[in-house]
Amino acid sequence: MSKQNNFRRYNPLIDEWVIVAVNRINRPWQGAKTEKSTTISTSSNTEQSILNPLAPGGTRSSGIANENYVSTYVFDNDFPSFTEFEECAGKDENDDLFKQHEVKGVCKVICYHPNSQLTLATMDVKEVRVVIDIWNQQYLELGPKYEWVQIFENRGAVVGCSNMHPHGQLWASNYLPTLPMKKHESQKKHFEKHGKVMLMDYLEQETLKKERIIMRNEHWTWLVPYWAFWPYETMLLPNRHVERFTDLGEVEKQSLSEILRSLLIKYDNVFECSFPYMMGWSGAPTGSFLTENCSFWQLHLSFFPPLLRSATVPKFLAGYEVFAEKQRDLSPEIAAKTLSEIDEEHYSKKLQ
Amino acid sequence: MSKQNNFRRYNPLIDEWVIVAVNRINRPWQGAKTEKSTTISTSSNTEQSILNPLAPGGTRSSGIANENYVSTYVFDNDFPSFTEFEECAGKDENDDLFKQHEVKGVCKVICYHPNSQLTLATMDVKEVRVVIDIWNQQYLELGPKYEWVQIFENRGAVVGCSNMHPHGQLWASNYLPTLPMKKHESQKKHFEKHGKVMLMDYLEQETLKKERIIMRNEHWTWLVPYWAFWPYETMLLPNRHVERFTDLGEVEKQSLSEILRSLLIKYDNVFECSFPYMMGWSGAPTGSFLTENCSFWQLHLSFFPPLLRSATVPKFLAGYEVFAEKQRDLSPEIAAKTLSEIDEEHYSKKLQ
Ligand SMILES: [Zn+2]
Ligand SMILES: [Zn+2]
């Protein structure tokens, strides 16, 4: 890997940026044809550490060995898109048609648990809570330094992650990326126009309409957004106004661990498989935004699962959707109804 | 299938619409795990017509049989996202947070050739020219009636099309979809600011820079956009200002058939496979836009191939990309260099 930072370029036709991570081209590729998500068959911890580069003591493709961790474990991504080197692999350009800027930051992997056979859905509430605390700690540590800290998880080969060890990622950057920038602007505009926080306003109306709400507890509501794109796309919202993850109280975090585990069990039960998904947190930006007014932001957790009809048939983002407009077949209301009615006990327990 | 039109909904967080095609949920699913693209092994025309629902005389999943066509063949999609029924499956809503509109239109399939074993890359120039004339005829026929006529092709199981019979699609709608709308606005803005057509201005600068131009003839230039996202994303541009496909002259269409075939051969040669791609035309909108000034538009043909390292390893759009910002690993300049240097003779001819 070259010792230079990557850069991003601007697409003036559709007003989006794209990161050009020339650093990463030589990284080993572990993925993944589209295949049924499976958990690794029962094996001892010793076998695991040989087989799985994310397990305690496991050796990663970079040759670095993991600590013998017993709870969560955070390490720097061996092939990061964001780095903090002195130089950049590309020069800044500022023309309207040729716009390119250096990107800096850090990319980490967050292992949720030492046991490769567990998932957030099959870990117990106490273990999920530990993951939530790790997320909080990362936001506290990286927020002051970076404009945007993206915590996310790709689960399953069908979304490009073939290692089923329970883990997510964190990418923190010295700039506000395309999508959070859009969310920043739209929430700001909504507040200026209506004097209300967009997603609070939205949650209030959904609470009355009822038809897209799947599950709620005292502090959180899980729903299918009216505008959902992915077949079983959902959003988890705090019931009160919360700008950032780090604004959550202890009780809210405890409550989050409960509803997060419950909703992931429901997901697994849809097709009786370890449901593949992309999951990501969004809240008010950090870094220089910490001293700005971001009160129009509402924290939310998005789930984008690609499966539509079975454990092996993913939704393709193709053709008309990449040239003109996205499309979904299943209505958001039917998706909400399916998820509402599905069992709250994990299917694997019933098979025993 | 219900006899009701579909609708689209607005996502106020990221300013995008999504089509909710509740009509389509019951369509038969022919796709596709990620697999190496293959052509059907040699078989007689009779066998083909039994095996392949897109071949002459073939029976489609709807039970409808194709004509015994000998050149190109256009038919209405049996499970269309756009229809022209009397009623809509959803009521119009116009709230800022709950915005939903009926969509109307037509979806067609365009078979390029009766022979299931050919592709645009392996057809001869005369046969490619016939496809171009069919595209032109469709634009002429549907343009006056619809605001946007999207001609596109998904090629290969990896982009969701498992039927290798040479074919593309056309979706025409009574509204301007999300991405063409963005292109409309950005090109307009560029013209207002610079007094130049954005993509003409861009082509002029790329012609001087040279490093992303792959191939050109008298009327067309094939290049990797500075802001390309897909690993081998490219764009084909007319050398002069052309607003719409139907503005192309006879000589330009002849020239297009030549360069289109040549560039697709290069694509196939990258990994010595029938290269999967999404291909789509964009030009000034039609319908009510035909009487408006759209002179800031430049016609272009985009190619979004998902392969990165081999015939079986696709790029995933996942994780960070769906929550924050798109990323590519290969630089646009290296992609351009690879495509420039690759052979112009189809690999299948060399294997013989
Ligand atoms: Zn992973
Ligand atoms: Zn197809």
UniProtKB/Swiss-Prot annotation, chains A, B:
GO biological process: galactose catabolic process via UDP-galactose, Leloir pathway
Catalytic activity: alpha-D-galactose 1-phosphate + UDP-alpha-D-glucose = alpha-D-glucose 1-phosphate + UDP-alpha-D-galactose
Cited PROSITE patterns: GAL_P_UDP_TRANSF_I
Compositionally biased tracts (Low complexity): 37-50
Cofactor annotation comment: Binds 1 zinc ion per subunit.
EC number annotated for this UniProt entry: 2.7.7.12
Quaternary data: Homodimer.
PANTHER family xrefs: GALACTOSE-1-PHOSPHATE URIDYLYLTRANSFERASE
Protein name (Swiss-Prot/TrEMBL): Probable galactose-1-phosphate uridylyltransferase
Organism: Caenorhabditis elegans
Lineage of producing organism: Eukaryota, Metazoa, Ecdysozoa, Nematoda, Chromadorea
